[in-house]
A protein has these predicted regions:
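Membrane-interface helix-loop junctions and terminal tails of multi-pass membrane proteins
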Residues: 1-249
C-alpha cells in the first residue's frame, strides 16, 4: 500500500508541475511575447518540455501519466488496475488544482486567466459582425479534441510498448507529440487533451466570473477520454498477436 501512495503522490506532483509551468508559460508569454506566433511556439514547447522533464523524473515511479485520459488508455490496455486508475485521477485533479493555485499566487491572486481552454475563433461563427460560439462550434471542438488526444495517446502507447523497444527514449517522443498536438490545436480549442489540466483552471477562473471554460468543460473532459479510449482500442487491434521483437545483431 505504501508503494501505491508513492505512485499517487508522484502523479499529483507531476500534474501540478505541468499545470503550473506549462499553463504559466502560456499566460506569461501571452503578456510579454510580441506576436501570436511567438506565443504559439512558446506554449507548445512548454507543454512538451514539461512532459519530457516529468517523464524522466517520475516515470519510473508512476509511469508519468499526469493525465486522466492517459490513465484511461492504460486501464483499457490493462497496464494499471481499476483501483490505481481511480486514485491516479484523483491525484491528477488535486495536482492540477495545486498547480493552478500556485500560478494564481504568482500572478498576485489573479484567477481570471489561468490557461483554461475555450473554443477559439477558428471554430466560431460570425453573427451580426461578431464571432460567437454556436452548437456547431462546440461539437467541432469536441471532434478536434478527440483527434488530438488520439494522436497523443497512440504515440504514448507505441513508444512505451516493451514488445518492440525498451522505451528509454519514450519521454522525448511523448514530449514532442504533445508539442505537435499543441501546435495543431491551439488555434481550434487551445488544446486540452487532458481533463485535469483543463478542469482546474476552469474552476478557479469561474470564481472571478470568467465561466467560459467551465461552461464548455464537458468538451475538455469527455473528448480527451473518448480519444484516449479510441487510441487504446485501435492500438490493441493493430498490434494484436505481435510478439516482442528480438534485438538486432
Amino acid at each position: 500500500m505504501k508503494e501505491n501512495w508513492k505512485k499517487y503522490l508522484a502523479e499529483c506532483i507531476g500534474t501540478a508541475v505541468l499545470t503550473f509551468a506549462a499553463c504559466g508559460v502560456a499566460v506569461v508569454a501571452g503578456q510579454i511575447v510580441e506576436g501570436q506566433l511567438g506565443w504559439w511556439v512558446a506554449t507548445s514547447l512548454a507543454f512538451g518540455l514539461v512532459i519530457v522533464a516529468m517523464a524522466y523524473s517520475i516515470g519510473n515511479i508512476s509511469g508519468c501519466h499526469i493525465n486522466p485520459a492517459v490513465s484511461l488508455a492504460m486501464l483499457i490496455r490493462k497496464k494499471i488496475t481499476l483501483k490505481d486508475f481511480c486514485f491516479y485521477v484523483i491525484a491528477q485533479v488535486v495536482g492540477a488544482l495545486v498547480g493552478s493555485l500556485f500560478l494564481a499566487l504568482c500572478l498576485r491572486g489573479n484567477f481570471s486567466s489561468l490557461g483554461g481552454n475555450e473554443i477559439q475563433d477558428l471554430l466560431k461563427v460570425t453573427v451580426d459582425g461578431e464571432l460567437k460560439t454556436d452548437v456547431w462550434s462546440l461539437f467541432a471542438g469536441f471532434f478536434v479534441e478527440v483527434l488530438l488526444t488520439f494522436i497523443f495517446v497512440i504515440a504514448i502507447l507505441g513508444s512505451t510498448d516493451e514488445r518492440y523497444h525498451d522505451g528509454k527514449h519514450a519521454g522525448i517522443v511523448i514530449g514532442l507529440s504533445l508539442t505537435l498536438v499543441h501546435l495543431l490545436g491551439l488555434g481550434f480549442t487551445g488544446t486540452s487533451v487532458n481533463p485535469a489540466r483543463s478542469l482546474a483552471p476552469a474552476l478557479l477562473q469561474a470564481f472571478t466570473g470568467n465561466t467560459t471554460s467551465l461552461s464548455q468543460i464537458w468538451i475538455w473532459i469527455l473528448a480527451p477520454l473518448a480519444g484516449a479510449a479510441l487510441a487504446a482500442i485501435v492500438y490493441g487491434v493493430i498490434t494484436k498477436g505481435k510478439e516482442k521483437s528480438e534485438p538486432q545483431a
